[in-house]
Structures are given as structure tokens and as C-alpha cells.
């Protein structure tokens, strides 16, 4: 697997607002169309209590890390065939790294 760039928080914030915020939050335990992303690093796929995941997500059994998120965000439907997520992915490595950096930093903050 290629080395993951460090990522830029502010650029990642823009990517999150443009590509993720419609379905996900990162600052609370709330769910929208998609589950909260708060605490995703180190969490097993399909594990947010009360969220109705696809069978594919529940059965994947991946633990989310910088590396697994980096690969997943390239092409979610290829990484987890059968996922309900409609997001096509981020082809640019820098955008994926920026988004991961933003999520990592937001997850360090107390939830609202």
C-alpha cells in the first residue's frame, strides 16, 4: 500500500462539507442517512449502535485505521461490495488524506 500523505485539516474540512456532511456528522453521536463518524478510527465496520447497516458493512469486519479508510475512500463500493453508501469515492490521494486528517482531529474533540 502506498504511503498516506499527512493531510491538511482545513482542506479536509472543505472536502467533508462538500462530500460527506449531507449524510454524516463527525461532532456528535447523531446519525443522519449515514452513521456518525465520531470515533471511527479504531472502530469495527458496521458497529455504531442503532444504525441500520447493510449486511455487507456488518460482515466486512474491518477495523478503521488511516490505512483502511484511505483505501475505502478511493472506491467504497469496491472495498465493501453491497454497501448502502452511494458515495463514489475520492480519486485524489491528497483529498483522501485531507479528509482523514480532518476526521482524526474532529474525533479528538468532545462530542456535542
From Swiss-Prot:
Known Gene3D superfamilies for this protein? Answer: Cytochrome c-like domain
Transmembrane annotation, as ranges: none
How is the protein modified post-translationally, according to the record? Binds 1 heme c group covalently per subunit.
- The primary site where this protein sits is mitochondrion
Record-level Gene Ontology MF annotations: electron transfer activity; heme binding; metal ion binding
| Key words of the record | Electron transport, Heme, Iron, Metal-binding, Mitochondrion, Respiratory chain, Transport
Q: Name one GO cellular component term.
A: mitochondrial intermembrane space
Assigned protein family: Belongs to the cytochrome c family.
- Briefly, what is this protein's role? Electron carrier between complex III (ubiquinol-cytochrome c oxireductase) and complex IV (cytochrome c oxidase).
Q: What is this protein called?
A: Cytochrome c type-1
This chain's source organism reads: Ascaris suum
Organism phylogeny: Eukaryota, Metazoa, Ecdysozoa, Nematoda, Chromadorea
